[in-house]
């Protein structure tokens, strides 16, 4: 590198890099837009101002640079011819560059404002500052609108309060006098029963300033010997936006103020109510906290148990009463809907409850299809047959009424064949097991349905049922003896045998008077003794 080039770089070397850096910085700032932070923008502005100051300095040094160029050109003339030609070409190029640089500097100086900065660059810089500010507010507005929608707006009734737990004898004058020490009471009303005119135990109160409401909710209040419960009045259209939790397991030494301060870390509290004993003034172990949004409730309910003053307290969501009623009703309806999804339709919820309150169903849950209904009817028949065998009573009429009721409850399902007859399933089961068909004589001796006066007999081919003995009819000695079962030594049978012996004794006496009786009608085989037949 020649000395001329070194001198040129020393004088004008910072000009080109500076201008290129300016263009690059401006392009980067235009591309970055809202993505650059304010700190980066300030740094870019400082760099821009410093570069502009450097641009102004070459204008003042143009004369000195021209003189130096003339000196260098004169020194070059002392060399060889080749050197002169090369130096002349270099000087020509340098002059061209110098003229272009000076023209740019003059243009910048002419376009500079009062402060010495170019208007175009100032406008670009200002636009860079304005773009983030113009874009950031919409994002902030979106987040703010979301929060405003999720939070309850209490500004409509910020001066109104709900007063609960009032004494029956508390009047509006007493209530106004008590709360008048917290501020000017503008409106007050105690709700009364329209029929009796007696107080319903709660009312509403309005102050002139919201600060009075803030003072009231900080402390506990006792009026006419009873602890009252003043709360902020929440508009009906804002109640769904609020969230309430139940807190249990609170220590007896916890005070209302520290209770509220502890739960304020999860959100803005509308009302914090720690239940206190009116006699001792200590905590009763539970309380309620109302937040201005449901998001705060979600945050505090992430853990079921929280440490508070060296104790584990329990956190639950507190639902309003009308929501609890809806959930209970939905639970009952879901039960009916589940049965409907299985293929059946009970018509309404009342029929569903009526069917499951029937003791004959015994927890049996039928599937609503023909095969399941057939199995259900068969199960009902077996149940009534078992009851007949245990009690000795005829349940045919009761069974038919039950079947008719089931037919009315489910009109869409046809009754299976022989559903109204009680004895048919048992006979069919005997036939399928291979037992012989009963004859007329067997039916006279023992039927499947036991009635009063007949003794139940079991077939030797089938295992006997382990059922309790029911009431028995009069003994038939001859039938028992012929069938091989022997004598029945039951006490009830002995009492019946005594009556039978009395009858036989009288009949035997009549035969003796006719000359054909034996021993006065007394039958030794009866093995009994009657006191009136001596």
Swiss-Prot record:
InterPro entries: Hrp1_RRM1, Nucleotide-bd_a/b_plait_sf, RBD_domain_sf, RRM_dom. Keywords: Cytoplasm, Methylation, mRNA processing, Nonsense-mediated mRNA decay, Nucleus, Phosphoprotein, Repeat, RNA-binding. It comes from the Eukaryota. The modification Phosphothreonine is found at residue 458. GO terms for cellular component: cytoplasm; cytoplasmic stress granule; mRNA cleavage factor complex; nucleus. Pfam families: RRM_1 (PF00076). Methylated by HMT1. The methylation is required for nuclear export. The modification Omega-N-methylarginine is found at residue 519. Residues 420-459 have a biased composition (Polar residues). Residues 37-78, 99-112, 121-144, 336-354, 460-475, 523-534 have a biased composition (Low complexity). The keyword Nucleus applies. The modification Phosphoserine is found at residues 2-3, 51, 87, 206, 460, 462. CDD domains: RRM1_Hrp1p (cd12577), RRM2_Hrp1p (cd12330). Residues 159-241, 243-320 form the RRM domain. It is found in: Cytoplasm; Nucleus; Cytoplasm, Stress granule. Residues 1-154, 316-354, 415-534 are annotated as: Disordered. GO terms for molecular function: mRNA binding; RNA binding. Residues 13-30, 81-98, 145-154, 478-505 have a biased composition (Basic and acidic residues). Gene3D superfamilies: 3.30.70.330. GO terms for biological process: mRNA processing; nuclear-transcribed mRNA catabolic process, nonsense-mediated decay; response to DNA damage checkpoint signaling. Interacts with NAM7. RNA-binding protein, which is involved in the polyadenylation-dependent pre-mRNA 3'-end formation and cooperates with the cleavage factor CFIA complex and the cleavage and polyadenylation factor (CPF) complex. May be involved in regulation of poly(A) site selection. Is involved in nonsense-mediated mRNA decay. Seems to bind to an RNA downstream sequence element (DSE) located 3' of a nonsense codon and may mark the transcript for decay. This is Nuclear polyadenylated RNA-binding protein 4. It comes from Saccharomyces cerevisiae (strain ATCC 204508 / S288c). The gene is HRP1.
């Amino acid at each position: 590198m020649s000395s001329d080039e070194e001198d040129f770089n020393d004088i004008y070397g910072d000009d080109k890099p500076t201008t290129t850096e300016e263009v690059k910085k401006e392009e980067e700032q235009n591309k970055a837009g809202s993505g650059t932070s304010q700190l980066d923008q300030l740094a870019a502005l400082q760099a821009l101002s410093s570069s502009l100051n450097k641009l102004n300095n070459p204008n003042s040094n143009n004369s000195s640079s021209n003189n130096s160029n003339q000196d260098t050109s004169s020194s070059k003339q002392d060399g060889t011819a080749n050197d002169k030609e090369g130096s002349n070409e270099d000087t020509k190029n340098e002059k061209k560059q110098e003229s272009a640089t000076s023209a740019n500097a003059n243009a910048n100086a002419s376009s500079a404002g009062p402060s010495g900065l170019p208007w175009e660059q100032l406008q670009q810089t200002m636009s860079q500052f304005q773009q983030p500010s113009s874009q950031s507010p919409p994002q902030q507005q979106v987040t703010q609108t979301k929060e405003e929608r999720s939070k309850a707006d209490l500004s409509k009734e910020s001066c109104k309060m709900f007063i609960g737990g009032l004494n029956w004898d508390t009047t509006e004058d007493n209530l106004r006098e008590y709360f008048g020490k917290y501020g000017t009471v503008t409106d007050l009303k105690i709700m009364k029963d329209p029929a009796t005119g007696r107080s319903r135990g709660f009312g509403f109160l309005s102050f002139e300033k919201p600060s009075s409401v803030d003072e009231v909710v900080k402390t506990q209040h006792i009026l006419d010997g009873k602890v009252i419960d003043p709360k902020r009045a929440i508009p009906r259209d804002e109640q769904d936006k609020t969230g309430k939790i139940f807190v249990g397991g609170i220590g007896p030494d916890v005070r209302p103020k520290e209770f509220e301060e502890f739960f304020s870390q999860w959100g803005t509290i509308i009302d914090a109510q720690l239940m206190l004993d009116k006699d001792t003034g200590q905590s009763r172990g539970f309380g309620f906290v109302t937040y201005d949004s449901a998001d705060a409730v979600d945050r505090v309910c992430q853990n079921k148990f929280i440490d508070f003053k060296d104790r584990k307290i329990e956190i639950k969501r507190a639902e309003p009463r009308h929501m609890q009623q809806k959930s209970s009703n939905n639970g009952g309806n879901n039960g009916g809907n589940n049965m409907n999804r299985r293929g059946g339709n009970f018509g309404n919820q009342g029929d569903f409850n009526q069917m499951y309150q029937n003791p004959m169903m015994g927890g049996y849950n039928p599937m609503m299809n023909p095969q399941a209904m057939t199995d259900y009817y068969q199960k009902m028949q077996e149940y009534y047959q078992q009851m007949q065998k245990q009690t000795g009573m005829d349940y045919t009429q009761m069974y038919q009424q039950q079947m008719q009721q089931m037919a009315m409850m489910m009109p869409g399902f046809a009754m299976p064949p022989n559903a109204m007859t009680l004895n048919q399933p048992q006979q069919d089961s005997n036939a399928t097991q291979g037992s012989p068909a009963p004859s007329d004589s067997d039916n006279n001796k023992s039927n499947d349905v036991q009635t009063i006066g007949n003794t139940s007999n079991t077939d030797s081919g089938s295992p006997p049922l382990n059922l309790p003995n029911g009431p028995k009819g009069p003994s038939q000695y001859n039938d028992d003896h012929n069938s091989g079962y022997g004598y029945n030594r039951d006490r009830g049978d002995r009492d019946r045998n005594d009556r039978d012996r009395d009858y036989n004794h009288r009949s035997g006496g009549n035969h003796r008077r006719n000359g054909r009786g034996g021993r006065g009608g007394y039958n030794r085989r009866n093995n009994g003794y009657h006191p009136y037949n001596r």
